């Protein structure tokens, strides 16, 4: 599949005919429709709180703008998941803690009770996630919601981009308690597949996680890190990335070095948004909601 797959092309490649946008099809979808358990959640990612630079002259207002956009949704999501890079990294421990404290204060204004987090490398890569865990709790966990099993992975606390054998064993044990037909949703910061390793858009042992997930019939992965919408299939598993809340990156490999897309003063906040992921009876249908 192309490195840069947008929503319409993904639908065609996945054989979904523009009707749904997910890997989670079949019996689960019919069961959801019958039980009235349809719901949606919001994925927010890469807020980089504390960033200052020409890539976003409105950096101090962008996260607050995103919170306001989510609060303005006609219907409240069942929960919100932040998929990492909550803050912009710094080697200064006091400043990093200050940014985490400020981030928590801003997102406390979200009008949704259930707000969850996983780390990005900016949050956890400098100290193996120790400060993140103090401020936000454990970095990998699972939970169940309306018939769906959700798994939050940490593929950033190891600064070399590994999930690690202990966490992979935890993933295997966690999933083994569930039927192969139960829908599984995985959250991670980095992509689990090799999207573009030259730009660090990969997880070095992500293939092992995909191998663990492959026996399950309905698996969808939501991730961040690449600051743009992207959709990919590994076998039956669908992978969907979120836009950033601070700056967009260009398409993978479109320029020699990875650098932010320059700020466009005529279209401020272009390419910044969050994901609304809706169960539509026949699966999850993610859609990007701009904050502009």
Predicted regions and their residues:
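Short acidic, glycine-rich surface-loop motifs adjacent to enzyme active sites
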Residues: 179-195
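Active-site neighborhood of phospho(di)ester-bond hydrolases with catalytic His/Asp-centered motifs
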Residues: 44-45, 80-84, 115-121, 187-188, ...
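Short, solvent-exposed aromatic-acidic interface loops
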Residues: 288-292
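Extended active-site neighborhood of metal-dependent phosphoesterases/phosphodiesterases
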Residues: 92-183, 203-220, 232-287
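N-terminal active-site segment of His-dependent metallophosphoesterases
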Residues: 13, 28-97, 173, 180, ...
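Solvent-exposed loop/turn segments at secondary-structure junctions
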Residues: 47-50, 86-89, 121-125, 156-159, ...
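Short, motif-level signal for alpha-helix interfacial/capping segments enriched in acidic residues
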Residues: 25-30, 61-64, 200-216
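N-terminal export signals
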Residues: 1-4, 9-30
């Amino acid at each position: 599949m192309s490195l840069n797959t947008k929503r319409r092309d993904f639908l065609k490649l996945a054989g979904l005919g523009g009707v749904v946008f997910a890997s989670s099809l079949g019996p689960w979808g019919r069961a959801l429709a019958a039980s009235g358990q349809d719901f949606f959640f919001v994925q927010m990612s890469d807020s980089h709180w504390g960033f200052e630079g020409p890539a976003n002259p409105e950096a101090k207002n962008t996260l607050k703008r995103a919170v306001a956009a989510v609060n303005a949704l006609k219907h409240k999501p069942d929960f919100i998941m932040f998929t990492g890079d909550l803050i912009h990294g710094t080697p200064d421990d006091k400043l990093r803690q200050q940014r985490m404290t400020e981030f928590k204060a801003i997102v406390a204004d979200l009008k949704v009770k259930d707000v969850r987090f996983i780390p990005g490398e900016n949050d956890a890569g400098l100290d193996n996630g120790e400060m993140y865990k103090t401020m936000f709790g454990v970095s990998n966990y699972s939970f169940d919601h309306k018939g769906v099993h959700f798994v939050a992975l940490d593929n950033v606390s190891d600064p070399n981009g590994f999930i690690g054998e202990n966490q992979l064993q935890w993933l295997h044990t966690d999933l083994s308690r569930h039927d192969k037909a139960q829908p599984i949703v995985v959250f991670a910061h980095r992509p689990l597949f090799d999207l573009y390793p030259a730009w660090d858009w990969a997880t070095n042992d992500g293939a092992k996680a995909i191998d663990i997930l492959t026996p399950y019939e309905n698996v969808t992965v939501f991730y961040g890190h690449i600051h743009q919408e992207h959709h990919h299939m590994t076998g039956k598993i669908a992978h969907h990335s979120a836009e950033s809340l601070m700056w967009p990156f260009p398409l993978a490999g479109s320029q020699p070095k990875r650098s932010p897309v320059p700020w466009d003063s005529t279209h401020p906040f272009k390419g910044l948004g969050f994901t609304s992921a809706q169960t539509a009876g026949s699966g999850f249908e993610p859609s990007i909601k701009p904050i502009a």
